Amino acid sequence: MHVTSVVVRGMLFTCMMGCSLLAQRSRRYSDAPDPERATQDWLDQCRDSNNRNGDDRERFCEVREKRLDPSRGLDIDGRQNGGVSVHGWDRPQVLVLAKIQADGEDVDEARDIASQIEIQTADGRVRAEGPSTRRHQSWAVSYEVWAPQQTDLHLVTQNGGISVQNIDGRLELTAVNGGIALNGVSGDVHGQTTNGPLNVELDGGRWRGNGLDLQTTNGPVNLSLPDGYSAHLETGTVNGGMRIDFPITLQGNIGRRIATDLGDGGPTIRAITTNGPVNIRRR
């Protein structure tokens, strides 16, 4: 196990008229961040965020590296304070960077808190267990993960976002206070958040798999898709505007929800919100 650590201080509705799969995959993999660079960037960010609000506590930042067998899929729980980000890559293993942040009244106390945090990874279930804390103490663990493109994911967060890039599989995504961001995903994808945006960027000519079903209670829907993309699109909002920057043919009543076939139709792409705008653009 590789460990890197550092101690630091203290409804308007508008419709405006108007390469190969291998190449796409190659581009996808090149888009994934380098793990070593991601580690250093996070440590720098952890250091820079300390004492910005007059907090005189000391902070200990540490990144622990875990390597897992991808055959069981991944089940990651961010617990109370931690986001989860997953990138698809072309290697036959899973790499997990557990980003640990511990705060205490002095450096030794912060380091001691971090030393009591255990990252559990049995059977592909990733969890952090740590000590109880008192006033002026806290700890949090977030995860950045690299996995084979064909990987099933079950991701849960309470106070943190979920981001998935270039993964094809069965995805179950649940957040409470945090957004869901998807880029180049495919398969059978379901996700929901209570407080946070839905940001989705699709690629290719059509959805590969059973479909996409996302919803948020409080947050916008932002969907970007390539020119000529084919799918059955469903979207809507209760309290918010809706904007689509290309012409569509609506099915059923025009109200707070719309349904339409894009191109030749296909699997359903559904993204809805209760309180927030909907923005769909073609690129």
Give the location of each predicted region.
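Right-handed parallel beta-helix
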Residues: 60-71, 75, 85-87, 112-174, ...
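Short beta-strand/loop motifs in extracellular/secreted proteins, especially
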Residues: 82, 94, 151, 231
